[in-house]
Swiss-Prot record:
<feature type="transmembrane region" description="Helical; Name=Segment S2">
    <location>
        <begin position="474"/>
        <end position="495"/>
    </location>
</feature>
<feature type="region of interest" description="Disordered">
    <location>
        <begin position="230"/>
        <end position="260"/>
    </location>
</feature>
<keyword id="KW-0472">Membrane</keyword>
<dbReference type="InterPro" id="IPR005821">
    <property type="entry name" value="Ion_trans_dom"/>
</dbReference>
<feature type="region of interest" description="Disordered">
    <location>
        <begin position="721"/>
        <end position="775"/>
    </location>
</feature>
<comment type="similarity">
    <text>Belongs to the potassium channel family. B (Shab) (TC 1.A.1.2) subfamily. Shab sub-subfamily.</text>
</comment>
<feature type="modified residue" description="Phosphoserine; by PKA">
    <location>
        <position position="796"/>
    </location>
</feature>
<keyword id="KW-0406">Ion transport</keyword>
<dbReference type="GO" id="GO:0008076">
    <property type="term" value="C:voltage-gated potassium channel complex"/>
</dbReference>
<feature type="modified residue" description="Phosphoserine; by PKA">
    <location>
        <position position="690"/>
    </location>
</feature>
<keyword id="KW-1133">Transmembrane helix</keyword>
<keyword id="KW-0630">Potassium</keyword>
<feature type="glycosylation site" description="N-linked (GlcNAc...) asparagine">
    <location>
        <position position="756"/>
    </location>
</feature>
<dbReference type="GO" id="GO:0005251">
    <property type="term" value="F:delayed rectifier potassium channel activity"/>
</dbReference>
<dbReference type="GO" id="GO:0016020">
    <property type="term" value="C:membrane"/>
</dbReference>
<keyword id="KW-0812">Transmembrane</keyword>
<feature type="short sequence motif" description="Selectivity filter">
    <location>
        <begin position="623"/>
        <end position="628"/>
    </location>
</feature>
Amino acid sequence: MVGQLQGGQAAGQQQQQQQATQQQQHSKQQQQQQQQQQQQLQLKQHQQQQQDILYQQHNEAIAIARGLQAATPADIGDNQPYYDTSGNVDWERAMGAGGAGAYGGIGIGSLPAAGGAAYHLGPANPAGLVSRHLDYGDGGHLAGPSAGLPAGAVGSGAGAGAGAGASVTGSGSGAGTGTGTGAGSGSGSGAAGKEVRYAPFPVASPTHSIPTTSQQIVGSVGGVGVGGASSQSISGGVPTHSQSNTTGALQRTHSRSMSSIPPPEPFMIAQSKAVNSRVSINVGGVRHEVLWRTLERLPHTRLGRLRECTTHEAIVELCDDYSLADNEYFFDRHPKSFSSILNFYRTGKLHIVDEMCVLAFSDDLEYWGVDELYLESCCQHKYHQRKENVHEEMRKEAESLRQRDEEEFGEGKFSEYQKYLWELLEKPNTSFAARVIAVISILFIVLSTIALTLNTLPQLQHIDNGTPQDNPQLAMVEAVCITWFTLEYILRFSASPDKWKFFKGGLNIIDLLAILPYFVSLFLLETNKNATDQFQDVRRVVQVFRIMRILRVLKLARHSTGLQSLGFTLRNSYKELGLLMLFLAMGVLIFSSLAYFAEKDEKDTKFVSIPEAFWWAGITMTTVGYGDICPTTALGKVIGTVCCICGVLVVALPIPIIVNNFAEFYKNQMRREKALKRREALDRAKREGSIVSFHHINLKDAFAKSMDLIDVIVDTGKQTNVVHPKGKRQSTPNIGRQTLDVQSAPGHNLSQTDGNSTEGESTSGRNPATTGTGCYKNYDHVANLRNSNLHNRRGSSSEQDAVPPYSFDNPNARQTSMMAMESYRREQQALLQQQQQQQQQMLQMQQIQQKAPNGNGGATGGGVANNLAMVAASSAATAVATATNASNASNTAPGSEGAEGGGDGDGGGVDDDNLSQAKGLPIQMMITPGEVAELRRQVALENLQNQRMDNLEQDVPVEFECCFCTTKGLPGCHGECIPLRANSV
């Protein structure tokens, strides 16, 4: 037993020793791996530093060495510096008055040559070329950089170099000598393939974007020796040049918005407007030139807003096409009214164009953003009167179309037949068959009227027992006509959509009166044929109905607009007709009495009484004058003359009103018929595919007005902290650049806006929007230069001289990006979950405080503060650093109690008020450059899906740039600012 125990103990000890040995070996392996990783990291850092130095030396050496060949005849002597897209001097194209010789003046520690305005590389460097970074350098590198003598030493040297380029386009080699201060010699080899982008004007607002090659440098660069102040020579290997087929930034200035050429960069647009004091406005092919400052007089108009646009997207929202090379903006509009509108910018006086339709002129005023209230007094009355008349005509036309559209026949096969029959009998213009039926109906009306007239001729009458009777043949013709009228009336009544409306219609009543006397007469004659005593009375009644047959001629009013207008005039001019009858009655009474007393004493006078004189007075006042009765005395003739003159005046007074009513109704009827014909023609053309309907004459403007997305304004006027509303301001860190403090608490306006919010206006009542972390419009145009060595070479632009933010109502606001509604919906769900988590955290905190003993208050308070900091960090990404600092402060606070560490803001924690203020903020999301295309696609899809045309009053486009905080791996580069399209509210 003892041996077994000893053996077991020995085995256990051996196993423990093996485990300890394995642990030691494992720890050694981990240490070795860590050392290897550190060595690799140091090696990478060293290689990166060496590569950066080589990049800098390589770029400057290439710039100086190929300056002579890069110069073009147009560049030499233009006395204008050239810049790359980062806002730095492009040393390859920096021409001066001295031409290419100016490059000779650039040396180590030397001054520029006397012949030109070349750029100084900087202070003296005792070891070689001054190290400068061009910010976009991405070419090859030199295996052995040139080395020079200390500055100030006098000597001479020679440089030679040779090498083969890694680029497929070619290689280069060269040698040269130079004399002067700081001459150097050296050799090296390596590949050089560098993208160069340049613009023909200074850059005040550098904007990084996706590179586009306009000129490639290939080949190797050998040793480089830099000449001194004598400007005689530059030695070194000169690389070969090859032009690329891709489009560069210089060519982009010639691009137009509708072409396939990439749009120009925002800084190009801004500098084009800064360089040119005039601008060409092309409206419908007619060019106008105007000063930019003239357009600034009306900043809220379309041309005034065009002056402030600095991005391609903002410009194409306002115009249809443009060319920076020609300094021309094109508007696809009618040019007739633009001269008057442009004169309004110049003189401040707006006049209408008489040759134009008033509605077309009004549409042009609305398009250019000019209010019609600016019209001069000489044109105000004429403009509004003409516009009111046109609107009244359009209203009546729309009313006619509305009445036509109100005819409802229901659904189903029977309704289709009913509608077809109604249009066939009631609307002759709808089809050829309807016109044929209308012609047949007119022929029957005329035939019936002729038969009625011929029946009165004695030669055609039939004598029965000494009593004249109707001709049997003409009676048969009349019977056929009455049968047609009866059938037509029954079919029209059965097909009408509204029976009661049809029955009380004026024309339908005439149709009924045209056929009813025939059947009444026929019925009376047949029923009283044997009653001899009553037959004579029946014949008198029949004669009355026979007289009513003449009303058949009024059936022509259904097919004649003039007859309908006459009936409308008589119906709507009853007041004027009554006034006319009153005037005539008074005149007849007065002049008949005077004529009676003047003529009663004459022998064989016809004025035997006043009623007998009414006839004479009536025909005299109406200027008819039959002559059957006339005065014979001198006084009677004077009375007759005065009666005639008064009759002319009395009759002429109400006649113009009656005539106007007739003309108005006739014009309305003709307009209604034309409107129906035009609408039917358009419907027929649409069915046949001859035309395509559209909603707005300017499709681009319609698309701009249909955009309804979300944008965010960060007002820099009020600097209030998100989590510390008491005034403890803390900035939010960002990747590679310093961001703004996000506003909250009282007065913050980090919320949805329509682009018209004024400064300090709170729009928190609307739905909050989403923005990317650090995605804002930063107008600090010297941000890149502060971290660049070239900052010492050129003067930096101040923030006051930079391009101002684009906002009409709030110029101090900085516009940031927008997101789609789907992102907002997801954020609302996330906010709801966060609020629930906050409530749970608060409940847990209360439970912990109740259960925790008094002695452990400090530790408990620190834990609660940590929880609260986590909640605050999940509520708003911009408050991450603040909440973390608060939690650290509460953890390190000695002797703090649980209540103080958990809820008191003095200890660095987050209180309930801060939480309630923080949870209303939106979630900040990070946007990477790879998501730009997807973001633009979502924005375009939402624009097409919304297609809102109801918000036409707001027409102010909102511009912004979204700065995506990424890195290119090169020093001095802090991301890309890519312009996106915003809503045109």
